[in-house]
Amino acid sequence: DSTSRCLAFLPLAHAYGCAFDFLTAFCCGSHTTYLGKVPSPKILMKALSEVKPTVIFTVPLIIEKIYRKQIQPMLEKKSMRFMLNVPLLDTTILATINKKLTETFGDEFKEVIIGGAALNPEAEEFFKKIGFRFTVGYGMTECAPLISHSFWHEFKLHSVGKVLPTMEAKILSNDPQNEVGEIIVRGENVMLGYYKNE
């Protein structure tokens, strides 16, 4: 809606960035700020604190970098490992980390939507444990680009949400018990084919 704010920093030449940082924001009347620079951590954090987006579309690389460079070193300290094993103190520490992380992303977002690649399971588990408002979606360019998504409060660990109501999906495998299958989807947003590729 017109009260929502978006900070666009994904490449608009890619389906994910084009669909959500541009088209969805445009169609919803969202106020969109385009970063216009390569999103280094410093530039991105400054922009997030100024824009205070209400929804954030990002890729795993950015979330994982924050986890690896800022959170993980703190968690690996001997004193922190000890404190995280003390009942009540652990929940206070995790709540504080969530609060600071939420502030880092501008403090006003409804959820951070991660897509474009798989999220590191360790980072995903940690963010879920602290109650960070994030979700992981799945899609591909050929599906304009979304296939599945769940809102953060419904999101299950190591999943990519529920298949969209306008789509059908199934996994094909000759031997489902022993062989990884292929995900196939059908729906109004799936392209018919490639240009001049009869």
For every predicted segment, state its role:
Residues 56, 93-198:
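Conserved AMP-binding/adenylate-forming
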Residues 1-5, 12-100:
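Conserved AMP-binding/adenylation subdomain of ANL enzymes
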